[in-house]
Structure formats: structure tokens, C-alpha cells
Amino acid sequence: MVLPSMNKSVEAISNNHLQQPNKFPLINGLADVRDYYVANCLLFKLNKGSLRIENEFGEFIEQSALCLFLLEKDQTITLSMSEIEGHIDFSSLEVSYDLMQKFYKVFYSTRNYNDRELSLKTKPKYFFHADLLPGMSDTFDSILHGVACPRVCSNVSIDDHDYSYFSLMYLISAFVRKPGGFDFLERAIKITTKEKVYNIIISDLTRKWSQAEVAGKLFMSVSSLKRKLAAEEVSFSKIYLDARMNQAIKLLRMGAGNISQVATMCGYDTPSYFIAIFKRHFKITPLSFMRTMNH
């Protein structure tokens, strides 16, 4: 995701994961995206239609437009989208770990003690929704439309004094004092070994990563890496697959290339194998996904 900035020291909203507004041709009024791994905190604005989000913990939320969602990182979700009066339209912004750390420091320093205590006593929530108050929709769209995004984008940073920085902080503030909001923020600034491995792999998917190479990047032995991942109940191969499939979704949705090109960019040697893996993972073929998202 590319946001205008002069400062390269702070990761912006990460890796060109800006999703442009989409309108869906739907079968029986529904469109699903299954088993999507949320790698970074995600702001999701529903402009038309209705949306149900469910994660692997059994938590779910269902709302109709107009509203804004905030999704926690490091969870696997299913999105079920329904048209209303023939329409569904949404946009999303992915907020990096580094940027969430900065927001946390600001919100924590201005916290109300009782609000924070209430939040920490609340059952963990992995996503929230907020009605769009005056100015929120325009603020979201100004960030979205202020992005100059080429077909395949590089990492670009966001300055602490950039307009987009304060705009995002304003949007996220709508969720902070909701029950569970501070707890959400405190989890957002923690990073697991799984996430560290994911970030290394997705930094260059054309490379054939081995566990030894990734362990070296993390300054640990292969056995230590395996032990840490086992403690988090995840395997190296599962993380590798999530990184490839997430990138495939984003590239296909951006229209960054044909299926063969996307397969190569995601580290697959043959398009046929990529298609089989994609279909097995998302329960839809890459071609059907492209037709749906880029209609």
C-alpha cells in the first residue's frame, strides 16, 4: 500500500495492500472469501450491501452498510458478503504493525483508567464495527484516493506528521474506547514468531525459502524455530502457504497480471499447480475470483 510520505523510516500501511473499492456480481446474492489470513490490522469500510465476518475462534459479526470494521491481525477469517438492492461495495486499508505501535503510544498516553480496566476485563474481541459518524467516510476515502498505486507497488512509508497518519488515527479512535478496545491495541503491538516468519517469507515470495534460511534471519537455530512454532500451534509450511495465498489474492484483485504471472510472483513454478492450491485453499478458482473481483 502506498501512502504519500517523505520519511522512509516508518513502515506505512504495509506492502501495497490497499484494496480499491469493488462491486460484486453475486450468485444468490452472496459472495464468500474463505480462509483468509489477516496478516495486519485491517480497516474495512462497507459502502453498500451487508457483511458477515467469522473467525476460527467462532466469533462473528454481521452488519449492513454504511459502517466501518476493524479486524485484528493474526487470525483466519471467512467473509460472507450479501447484496442489498443489487449492490455490494467495500474498501479496505491494511495498517502495519509499526504504525499500530505508534497509535498505541498515543492512545495509551491519553487513556482513561476506568475505560482501560473495563476493556481488559472484557472477553477478547477480534473485530469491531462502528457506525460512520460525520466525516469518517470522507476521511477514509481521502486516504484511499490519496494513494498513487502502480500495478505492483513497493514498500513506502508514512510520516508521523503526514495527513494520512492523523486521518488513520482518527478512524481507529472510533474503536479504542469500545469494550475490549484497549485489549485489542495491546495485542496489536505484540508480534509472534509466526508473524515474524510470515513477514520474512512475504518480503520475497519468488525466493524458495527454507526453514534454515528463515531461522538464520531470526538469529535462531532451526530446532528453536520449530519449537517456537510448535508452541504457537502452527507449522512452517502453513505460514508459507498463507503468505503465498494472501499475495495471490491481492495480486489477482489488483489485476497485477494474468494467472501465470501471478503464479510466478507467488513463487510457483507451474500455473496448474498454483491453480490447484488456490482452489483447495479458497474453494474458488483464480479465474472465477478474478472475474468476481474485477467485474
Swiss-Prot record:
SS bond list: none
Query: Which residue spans does the record list as DNA-binding?
Result: 212-233, 259-282
Gene3D superfamilies in UniProt: Homeodomain-like
Q: Where is the signal peptide?
A: none
GO cellular component terms attached to this protein's record: cytosol
Listed SUPFAM superfamilies? Homeodomain-like (SSF46689)
Xref: PANTHER family:
HTH-TYPE TRANSCRIPTIONAL REGULATOR GADX
Q: Summarize the protein's role.
A: Positive regulator of the expression of the invasion-associated type III secretion system encoded within SPI-1 (pathogenicity island 1).
Q: Which NCBIfam families match?
A: PRK15044.1
What is this protein's record name? Transcriptional regulator SirC
**What is the native source organism of this protein?**
Salmonella typhi
